[in-house]
Amino acid sequence: PRSTLFPYTTLFRSYGKLCAAWFGHPERKMRFIGVTGTNGKTTITNLIKHILTENGRKVGLIGTIQNEIGDEIVHTDNTTPFVYDLMALYAKMAEAGCDDVVMEVSSFGLVQQRIGETHFAAAVFTNLTQDHLDYHGTMENYYQAKKLLFSRCDTAVIDTDDDYGKRLYSEVTCPKIAYG
């Protein structure tokens, strides 16, 4: 008998779409800001959350230390939760009236398509240093993993003090802002 094999990427993309539909597409109900890089994600996501909150926005936070829905703290196991858990979290945030979600987006989350169909109003790149090479194998693979975030954003904010940031700045096609 003949069997059909689904490529890994197709399977996870389809699963992400299914999870989003199951939860009523919460990723379409809020504005998202994603932060990626080896270091600084937690600091930057918390600063952005504070700025938005001080300007009257209700903000959800997804990160390494904890997830937050307004003032409620929600336990986390991964920097970027797996897609089913992420969509469930988005749904709770939307139900709680969150306007925005600020999230750390890990290289693992990007490669494993944990963020589903999430589109980001802004994506921030902090830096890239040697880390997770046991998973990615090479710095080039690690860079390409981080770069995936910038194919799904309206505006890129990139630290150009970093050599990989300079490269990313030259390669992204969306409107971009340099800092550093």
Q: Which residues does each PLM region occupy?
A:
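Short, small-residue-biased leader/transition segments that mark boundaries at the very start
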Residues: 1-11
